[in-house]
Amino acid sequence: MMTSTRALVAGFLLALSSPALTTALAAQEAPATTVAADPAAPVWAFEESDVPVDESFIFGRLDNGMRYIIRRNATPEGTALVRMRIGSGSLAETEDERGLAHYLEHMAFNGSKGIPEGEMVKLLEREGLAFGADTNASTGFESITYMLNLPRNDSTLLDTALTLMRETASELTIAPDAVDRERGVVLAERRDRAGFQQRNFEDNVAFLAPGARYAERLPIGTIASLEGATAQHIRGLYERTYVPANTVLVVVGDYPVEQVEAAIRARFASWTPAPVPTEPVTGPIDITRKGLTDIHLDPALAEEVTLSRFSAWRDEPDTVANRDAALARRIGYGIVNRRLARLARGEDAPFRGASFGTGELFEAARITSLTISSADGEWEKGMRAAVREVNEALTHGFTRAELDEQLANLRTAFENAAKGAETRSHGAFVNAALALASDDRVPTTPEWQLAQFERIAPELTPEAVWQAVREDAAPLAEPLIRFEGRTAPAGGAEALRSAFAAAMALPIAAPADNGPLAFGYGDFGSPGEVVSDT
């Protein structure tokens, strides 16, 4: 099942019809702007949610608008993690800034007012802090995150870490000569990523999202924009997006929260407030897009066919009711995918693997997809089997035994999480904090999650989870069909569409319902006799 808003972006991108496309493109090339933060707006998502926040987190906001999240944790003991999330990524770039959010990430390690160029890496090494590609920073569509893993929990190292983050926040020098020296590194990184996976992604974008803004704002940028980047260009993006109200600092580790909070205030209170950047355009989007076919070939690609349809995005804030609904959908998709997995593991399996699910694309649209991976030349066999299985599930529903299996697996997962609540790693808490910052997902305790599951589980029926999936999934009629692999399918696009039509026409039948699952070992034979107890 696909659920993550951001995880789907690389796989599925959208487009609009020509009239809307013209309007949206005109809008997206308007000058970048900022807006004043609304002081009356909620600071955190849990302020407007009935989902109870984990009170072991400490949440705060400085007068300049910067927010912070602190959590004391001793797993592993004597260590800590520090993260600084800037709430703008490559989507915030203008046309001539493409790739500069990532370029700016590089410049964070090339000199600031308090740490001269070349000294930051030495400082990291002296303090035993890890340094390397993707170790200290990461740039995405919607954010840039700076990362430091502290191997000790002394106050000096905490101060050093916060100093590095504070310098990055507003004190970078972005000197022209330093920009020129780093250009080769950035271009080399882009070349290194320009392999078959990148080509496959770009073809997918061109098929699903011609002209969509986020299809044209890959974080790695373009050769032309990177070669032409100047210190002035980079500084313009820096000053527009690195502002207190657009920043969340997270510290999780073996420190007293009072110490961390005081250190944050001491370092960041002087950061001058500024308007937050406006939300960037992510579309244009046409959720009626259908009936098109794409074939992408590369010697390095395994054979795979994806059938997709779009639907409208739904605003579903994090509430108890919405979590209940999401659980029902999760179980329903889990049953469908369990059936597909059983086919993949069977004798003379029709495909290597298949998955069915629905997820969000930013706040722009939703996409339902059935993806089938097959041995070379076996795509038609795989498509027929997978489409038939999904149609059967969506037409006739699920059995009690299938529901019980999903509930049992989920119960075990929730129980194990609750049992291990006191030994959760720093990373688990950091991920929860960043999910609140990025997706307004309220961090909760494992004990509460288990209690909520036990509350709703008795109310779930095969009919309920079936209807949840039927209402959530976009019908795969006239889907967008994308083929990728080493060898073109015989008959090309017409054969793909004909095979899909034939698969949709296959007869289907309701599965046998053998009732609730029962323990498989009910007869243990006659009791034995104790012959020795020594």
Where does each model-flagged region fall?
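N-terminal secretory signal peptides that target proteins for export/translocation
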Residues: 1-5
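Proteolytic maturation boundary segments
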Residues: 26-70, 256-341, 345, 404-408, ...
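Structured mid-domain segments that build the active-site/substrate or prosthetic-cofactor binding neighborhood
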Residues: 305, 312-315, 321-400
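Scaffold signal of the M16-like zinc-metallopeptidase fold and its non-catalytic homologs
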Residues: 32-42, 110-115, 133, 137, ...
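Generic recognition of stable, solvent-exposed alpha-helical segments in well-folded globular domains
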Residues: 99, 115, 119, 156-160, ...
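Active-site-adjacent, His/Asp/Glu-enriched structural segments that form or flank metal-binding
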Residues: 76-77, 86-101, 106-199, 225-228, ...
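Bacterial N-terminal signal peptides
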Residues: 9-20
